[in-house]
Regions:
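Active-site neighborhoods and metal-handling regions in enzymes and metal-associated proteins
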Residues: 1-426
Length: 426
């Protein structure tokens, strides 16, 4: 049975078992669901579950808490408690149905469940014999202990705690076959939508964003994975430009950083193309320089290469420096490369766009790691740089799954060769 698209109840149980195995004897992990966030007044944002909570439970509702306790030495020796809202027909008439306590056991396979409204009396007994608590639940706010911190202190003031995130990073960073399949589908849909956008002329950044948001959803994604960058002309030199409200100039390039989400897994793609559909000579020269660098980085996303993301970044810097020098850039000037390429070449991806926060880029890439490779060049409009490249911003990004001997590009449907981009409009 699938609890979320592509991910079975058994896979969620296996994840909990691996977490428990990572804890010391009688260690306890405590996770809180994300809160519903409000835009203004009573107007709320679409709900997004906290990623570690979702990874371990598949439960996509607020006002919930999960407790996982190691009970023995064998894989699978753990107890899973899931505290949720009880069914409430009157409240559900307003908000829509929620799962309730029985479903927490019958559907989400909790060993024990309870009313989240009674958590202050239900949680402390579970912590009394714990050897250590692993949690990222907030312990203080505005200098004062939170309700959760007081619950822990009521059990044992000397009970030690540690962050859960480092353990979760080690579990989440290597993707399962099911996770990779979800990311491949997200990449396939997103890539096709971006290619479809390249086929059409656009007058404004806003219209282009609206097209992508719609087509991601209409073609099977849950929606956009993040607020996209749609940056025409020199606005592409602002790495995270998301105003997306300016007119597009047919003589310039447009940079689009966008992707859809499928089964809560994301695609992360950047493409840059001429608004007119045809590259000028200068646009083509700079674009192809970045593309050569990007291809080099993607080719290193294999376990047999023995590379890290930091290592690929160094290769990218060296290759890009040579490419830009050949185009007439003064790369001997101190700080020139850092100004033209100010960000890292890649990051981990998965449930989050920047997945597994804190997991090092110095770690050797292994089969199952999923990363982005995204070199870019952002040329300021000033006399230190060749006149025909000034104001151009170009980035090319793919989502890539590391395999043993070759990379699996998850976003290959988004075309990136000059000949393919220009052929889209005949």
């Amino acid at each position: 049975m699938y609890l979320t698209p592509g991910i079975t109840a058994q896979e969620y149980a296996d994840r909990r078992a691996k977490l428990a195995q990572s804890l010391p004897d009688n260690g306890v992990a405590v996770l809180a669901a994300a809160e519903l966030k409000y835009r203004s007044g009573a107007v709320f944002y679409p709900y997004r579950q906290e990623s570690n909570f979702l990874y371990l439970t598949g439960f996509n509702e607020p006002d919930s808490m999960a407790v996982i306790r190691r009970t023995g030495d064998k894989l699978g020796d753990y107890v899973f408690h899931l505290f949720v809202r009880p069914k409430d027909p009157k409240a559900e008439q307003w908000s829509g149905p929620w799962s309730g306590l029985q479903a927490a056991q019958d559907v989400f396979n909790a060993d024990e469940t309870g009313d989240i409204n009674k958590i202050e009396s239900l949680l402390p007994p579970l912590l009394r014999s714990a050897s250590k608590i692993y949690t990222d639940v907030e312990l203080s706010r505005a200098g004062q202990p939170t309700k959760f911190a007081n619950m822990v202190r009521s059990v044992n003031r000397s009970l030690s705690s540690a962050p859960l995130q480092p353990i979760m990073n080690n579990l989440r960073v290597i993707k399962s076959k099911a996770e990779i399949a979800n990311m491949r589908l997200a990449g396939q849909i997103s890539g096709r939508c971006i290619t479809a956008a390249m086929r059409r002329p656009w007058d404004t950044e806003k219209d282009l964003q609206a097209f992508l948001d719609y087509t991601f959803t209409a073609n099977g994604c849950e929606g956009p994975a993040y607020v996209p960058v749609v940056a025409g002309g020199s606005r592409a030199n602002m790495i995270h430009y998301v105003h997306n409200n300016a007119a597009l100039d047919p003589a310039q390039l447009v940079l689009v950083d966008a992707g859809g989400e499928y089964g809560t897994y994301i695609a992360d793609i950047t493409r840059t193309w001429p608004v007119s559909g045809k590259f000028s000579a200068a646009q083509r020269d700079l674009y192809e320089a970045v593309l050569r660098v990007q291809r080099t980085g993607v080719a290193l996303c294999r376990e047999s290469a023995g590379m890290t993301l930091d290592g690929i970044h160094r290769v990218t810097e060296n290759t890009l420096r040579d490419q830009l020098r050949d185009l007439g850039f003064d790369m001997g000037r101190a700080g020139a490369l850092d100004e033209l390429f100010p960000h890292h070449v890649g990051h981990y991806i998965g449930l989050d766009v920047h997945d597994c926060p804190g997991y090092g880029r110095h770690v050797a890439l292994k089969a199952g790691h999923c990363v982005t490779i995204e070199p870019g060049v952002y040329v300021p409009d000033d006399e230190r740089f060749p006149a025909h490249f000034r104001g151009m911003g170009i980035r090319i990004e793919d989502s890539v799954c590391v395999d043993d001997d070759s990379p699996l590009v998850l976003t290959t449907e988004a075309v990136k060769e000059v000949v393919d981009i220009e052929a889209l409009r005949g």
